[in-house]
Structure formats: C-alpha cells, structure tokens
Amino acid sequence: AAVMAAGLTACGSGADTASAASPAADSTAAESTEAAADTAAPDGDGDPTTLTVAMECAYAPYNWTQNDDANGAVEIRGSSDYAYGYDVMMAKKIGEALGQKVQIVKLDWDSLIPAVMSGDVDCVIAGQSITAERAAQVDFSDPYYYASIVTLTKKDSAYANAASVADLAGATATSQLGTIWYDTCLPQIEDANVLSATANAPDMLMSLNAGKCDIVVTDQPTGKGALIAYPDFVMLDFGGAEGDFQVTNEEINIGISMKKGNTEL
C-alpha cells in the first residue's frame, strides 16, 4: 500500500494546555516511492493516477490562487486559475512519493472535512489544526507544521504596542470562521467586542484594513504575509509566554486529513 509522506495517525498530540508554540515545519516527503507506485487512493476523482487535494486557495502563505503556473503552481480543477503555497508544495511532494499527479480542488473552509468524509477528495492540505472534533470525523497525518499565534493591528492603533493578551482588552476583534483564532483565542480577550467571523483570511485582513475592527488574530505565516500586502499593519507576537493566548497542543498542530480508514494514504 502507498504510504503518505507525513505518516497516518488518527489524532494529533495530547491536549495539555500550552501557550503558542514556535513554528517548526516538517515537510519531508517519504523516502521510498516503490510501494507507492503499486497502489493508489480509491476516492477523489476516481482516477488511480491522481491525488485529489482540497484546500481554500485563499489562505496565504499556506495556499492561494494565481492566474498562471509560475513557480510550479498547480491548476485548480474546473478553473483556469492555479493554486500555490506551502500546502501545494506539500501536495506535490506527496504526489511524487505516491507516483501520482496532483489535482487541486478549491473549496470553502467549511466544505473541506465533508469533502473528505464523502470521498469527493483524497485528502485536505489546508493549514488544518488536528483537533479532537475533526479527528473524530477524519484521520490525520502526523503534524507537518506547528502554528504560532499572532495579532495584527494597524501601526496607529491604540493596541500597536500591546505586549500581552491583557493589553488587548476592549478591542474590537475578528478572525476567520471555524478556526481556533476565532473560537478559542478571541474569547480570551477581556471585554472584547467580537464581530462575526469572516469567511476567509483575505476577508479578515480587509476588515482590519477598512477599520471595521481594531485587531485580528491569526497564525504567524499569515501575519507575515499580511505585513507585505498591508504596510500599515503591525504584527504582535507575545512569544508563547504566560501573557500569550492559551491553547492546547492539538489546536496548533497542522496536519493532513483523509477519510477514516484510508490505509492507502
């Protein structure tokens, strides 16, 4: 049977409480490809020579949409656009190890897990945290990234010099729907005015840029990318200290999800 590069496991690491960890990517592909050539995933588009991978294509730097194949971008199924980013690079490495061509499927965040469960796609590589709730629905690889939490605000904001979560008290805040940034981190800000969640990361950043909120909470790679796109932003990293957002290890472990019992991957 084919072996997925990251190694299959039903859940992430333990749920001991921890502050935001430093990022440490482990995107090494499987060393052996001989076994991979013999067996292919049965789901996805039904083509045993294709690895069908779902992602938002709107979560830079993990994944994004562009109009050409520059830098090795992969065409999005049913579209003239292409996808690229860390997650696409990971998908291509796995495809190489399995001897399969990678096909990218663009889906909304809330549609990713259902697509895996139904077999519409082989796997999801989309900056997904390995939470207990998700692991009850799908299988996960070992983590390939450990996300760290940051806060974005504007340089002229009253919160630009915040040194801890406590300093964010009273802020108007938002983040992306269905993420730990919105569900777990924002409630930790005292007296925060928490707005409705945004549909995706670009909408989140545009809300901050338009002055609809004082701060947004996200992960470090997204934050660094935002600083390039929005020069008026400043990124606050509380360094995983006691004054940082408190999260469990499972919430910051990023893995690849696949259908329960999919031993081929």
Residue ranges of predicted features:
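Bacterial lipoprotein signal-peptidase II cleavage site
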Residues: 8-25
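Extracytoplasmic small-molecule ligand-binding "clamshell" domains
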Residues: 44-128
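Short loop->beta-strand "edge-of-pocket" segments that line small-molecule binding or catalytic clefts
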Residues: 52-54, 73-80, 164-179, 192-194
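Short helix-initiation/N-cap motifs at beta->coil->alpha
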Residues: 86-88, 103-115, 160, 195-210, ...
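Extended ligand-binding regions for polar small-molecule ligands
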Residues: 88-97, 155-157, 170-172, 179, ...
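Acidic, polar ligand-binding/catalytic clefts
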Residues: 96, 101-167, 242-249
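A ligand-binding cleft/hinge motif common to bilobed small-molecule-binding domains
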Residues: 111, 127-137, 183-188, 214-250
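Periplasmic-binding protein-like
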Residues: 146-153, 229-265
